[in-house]
């Protein structure tokens, strides 16, 4: 856990950031490699890395009946990215934990060595948490872009409107 942040900003048991997500970031992330815009531009042009946007949802979260995200604001991200809202929070419920696991398996084609780049916006801990979480799931080639869409757009790179991946709602079984 970074020593510069207050202990109360982190979950003592897991080490995930759980509050004040928009704050100064450390230089490194456990389980991942930090990249700068120049590095990300090269990976983007090569096209062999999965880009994962973990910007949190703004609005009422996902609808527990349909799994659709109820957003108050639209989101633009790096073209070709998969947007998985809220998976960078410090504590996830069972549904969001499964959502994260299932979507990583899907976008990596089940290959835990598939290169994936996680980002949000500048000074956002969501990608830091998501990298740690993906690493604990056994994913090995993880990149962290802490400047996120802010840094990307600042260098005149394209951003495009995005829609989040719908949450799969598992039916509940009632014993009769």
Name the predicted role of every residue range.
Residues 40, 48-55:
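Short hydrophobic beta-strand that contains or immediately precedes a catalytic carboxylate
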Residues 1-34, 43-46, 62-117, 122-176:
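Rhodanese-like catalytic fold shared by cysteine-dependent sulfurtransferases
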Residues 56-57, 125:
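Short, solvent-exposed loop/turn segments at secondary-structure junctions
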């Amino acid at each position: 856990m970074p020593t510069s942040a207050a202990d109360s900003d982190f979950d003592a048991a897991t080490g995930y950031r759980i509050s004040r997500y928009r704050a100064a970031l450390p230089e490194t992330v456990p389980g991942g490699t930090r990249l700068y815009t120049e590095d990300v531009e090269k990976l983007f042009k090569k096209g062999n890395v999965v880009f994962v946007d973990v910007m949190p949802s703004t609005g009422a979260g996902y609808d527990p009946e349909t799994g659709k995200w109820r957003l108050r604001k639209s989101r633009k991200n790096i073209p070709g990215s998969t947007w998985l809202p809220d998976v960078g929070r410090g504590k996830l419920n069972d549904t969001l934990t499964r959502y994260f696991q299932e979507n990583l398996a899907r976008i990596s084609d089940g290959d835990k060595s598939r290169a994936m780049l996680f980002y949000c916006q500048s000074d956002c801990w969501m990608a830091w948490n998501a990298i740690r979480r993906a690493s604990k799931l056994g994913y090995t080639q993880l990149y962290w872009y802490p400047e996120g869409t802010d840094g990307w757009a600042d260098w005149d790179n394209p951003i495009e409107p995005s829609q989040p991946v719908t949450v799969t709602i598992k039916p509940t079984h009632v014993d009769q």
